[in-house]
């Protein structure tokens, strides 16, 4: 994300970015606090989104596929057309969806992914990837901007380790897709569950699935009984707890 924002900042240094859909907090806070600000809209209707884009006139649009933690997926195909019409780059974070499950680069100008999570499966290495769409109208400007940026690099040891732990990523993603979907089905029949949030329920996510794609390793749910009951449930849950996802443990 940081490198994506550096590219955009070089092209449009005086404009804020626009986050479409409520995101993981750091995805919003990084452009808001370090670069030239960020705006957030949570509208899902594409006509309303287009009106907001015209009003704000951002440097770039940023979308999570799907959003974390609500697992919503906006209509990126329509938003991509709007972005092209208005000459605004579209940036996608596919960390939760995974490019093994969904095809987002076809509709985005830049796709970034956290390699710390699903790709590594170990949660003990900090790394990320960035893909530029070669068909983007901005491709030459993106490349020129990248050449001017002092890109952070992994150490040799971290690179070797990341390659090693990622060798089974295809199999892990398949297993995580399956396990998460099974958990969703079990929770759907539980009397204490009020709402479940999962990409399977989103037509926009389904429209992006690859031939072997699934719905990823993340779901969220809301309990009956309110906040106090949710706290008691969380504190009693005997699983590893942390701010990451996609690990083998």
Predicted regions and their residues:
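Conserved PLP-enzyme active-site core in the AAT-like
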Residues: 2-192, 197
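Conserved C-terminal alpha-helix-loop-beta "cap" of PLP-dependent enzymes
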Residues: 195-249
